[in-house]
UniProtKB/Swiss-Prot annotation:
Full protein name: Seed lectin
Entry-listed glycosylation sites: 111, 183
S-S bonds: none
Post-translational note: Glycosylated.
Length: 239
């Protein structure tokens, strides 16, 4: 089957191939700024998401085939007070008509009334909510805001983080790694995820981020570049 791939070394301020939701925008310098910044300072209660416009065929009912994919991106999270950060950024896969959910600790992906939203995410979580581990962490979330697997994350204020996420359909393994080139630290987490049971056949992929719900727990969430390749489940068009 044909490979679906795209690559952004930076983003277009008037993007045709990115769907912006909530507060997300692209700056004049080509940064994908997911949450609101005013006068150079991050704003609380902000939620922004960005989706690649073309849906991806993640599994195929007629053949039972499941797609493999790999995605890489760089992001920066910067906080005015590095002891008080919230709430985080995530890469996610969701139904093509996906809309922003609850802000704050739900990261724009989930909410407390509907626990079973079809969304698979890798979260880079900077605030410990009641359902979270007690430290900043990188988690793999399958249809729940509670991470199925996680690793503690030594977040670096204002430093570029390089992320690589891959899904191997044959072993149903979702793996995420984050590296800070500035100090050569890296973190890795992987989980067994059955995309066929977690998601519909077609999905959109993208990013979601939320700032904290109090004025002193805020941070920026900027994606600098993004590329992805996937070997789809079948040769067919989204209808």
């Amino acid at each position: 089957s044909e490979v679906v791939s795209f690559s952004f070394t930076k983003f277009n301020p008037n993007p045709k191939d990115i769907i912006l939701q909530g507060d997300a925008l692209v700056t004049s310098k080509g940064k994908l700024q997911l949450t609101k910044v005013e006068d150079g300072e991050p704003v609380d209660h902000s939620l922004g998401r960005a989706l690649y416009v073309a849906p991806i065929h993640i599994w195929d009912d007629s053949t039972d085939r499941v797609a493999s994919f790999a995605t890489s991106f760089s992001f920066v999270v910067e906080a005015p007070d590095e002891s008080k950060t919230a709430d985080g950024i995530a890469f996610f896969l969701a139904p093509p008509d996906t809309q922003p959910q609850k802000n704050g600790g739900f990261l724009g992906l989930f909410n407390d009334s509907n626990k079973s939203i079809q969304t698979v995410a890798v979260e880079f979580d900077t605030f410990s909510n009641t359902w979270d581990p007690s430290a900043r962490h990188i988690g793999i979330n399958v249809n729940s805001i509670e991470s199925q697997k996680y690793v503690k994350w030594g977040w670096e204020d204002g430093k570029v983080a390089n992320v690589y996420i891959s899904y191997q359909a044959s072993t149903k393994t979702l793996t995420a790694s984050l590296t800070y080139p500035s100090n050569a630290t890296s973190y890795i987490v992987s989980a067994n995820v059955d995309l066929k049971s977690a998601l519909p056949e077609w999905v959109r992929v993208g990013f979601s981020a939320t700032s904290g719900l109090s004025r002193d727990h805020v941070e920026t969430h900027d994606v600098l570049d993004w590329s992805q390749t996937s070997t789809p489940a079948a040769n067919s068009d989204y209808t």
